[in-house]
Amino acid sequence: MAVQRTFSILKPDATERNITGAINALIEKAGLRIVAQKRIHMTRGQAETFYAVHKERPFFGELVDFMTSGPVVVQVLEGEGAIAKYRDVMGATDPSKAADGTIRKLHAKSIGENSVHGSDAPETAAIEIAQFFAGNEIVG
């Protein structure tokens, strides 16, 4: 399997509880390297652009409000099959359905406050990474 990069967000429910280190430990334990990372307060415009795919969904406004409610940590992860590997480490969106040992099983508060986001495909990973990082900010 090829080395890939994927995009990750540690969401406001994770930063407010100061569990970003615990989440990073799970990421690294899975064999993924954090090659870029920064803590930001996402603007409304950034959140609306990032989640534009959900614009017509009834939860869009609530999602944007949540993602701008506090700091987030945006990351670029790298490793063999990084996209699938990180999705496995995150676990199901619904923490009650997530496998034991996954980030969401261990740390998510609810379906809405599920602690993390990860890219779902190489194309979306490239777009998401470019939204938050310049090339020289990614150091592999």
From Swiss-Prot:
Assembly description: Homotetramer.
Family: Belongs to the NDK family.
InterPro entries for this protein: NDK-like_dom, NDK-like_dom_sf, Nucleoside_diP_kinase, Nucleoside_diP_kinase_AS
SUPFAM superfamilies: Nucleoside diphosphate kinase, NDK
Keyword Metal-binding appears in the UniProt entry: yes
Transmembrane intervals: none
A Pfam short name: NDK
UniProt protein name: Nucleoside diphosphate kinase
Keywords: ATP-binding, Cytoplasm, Kinase, Magnesium, Metal-binding, Nucleotide metabolism, Nucleotide-binding, Phosphoprotein, Transferase
Catalytic reaction(s) noted: a 2'-deoxyribonucleoside 5'-diphosphate + ATP = a 2'-deoxyribonucleoside 5'-triphosphate + ADP; a ribonucleoside 5'-diphosphate + ATP = a ribonucleoside 5'-triphosphate + ADP
Cofactor(s) needed by this chain: Mg(2+)
EC nos: 2.7.4.6
Taxonomic lineage of the native organism: Bacteria, Pseudomonadati, Pseudomonadota, Alphaproteobacteria, Hyphomicrobiales
Cellular compartments per GO CC: cytoplasm
Gene, per the UniProt record: ndk
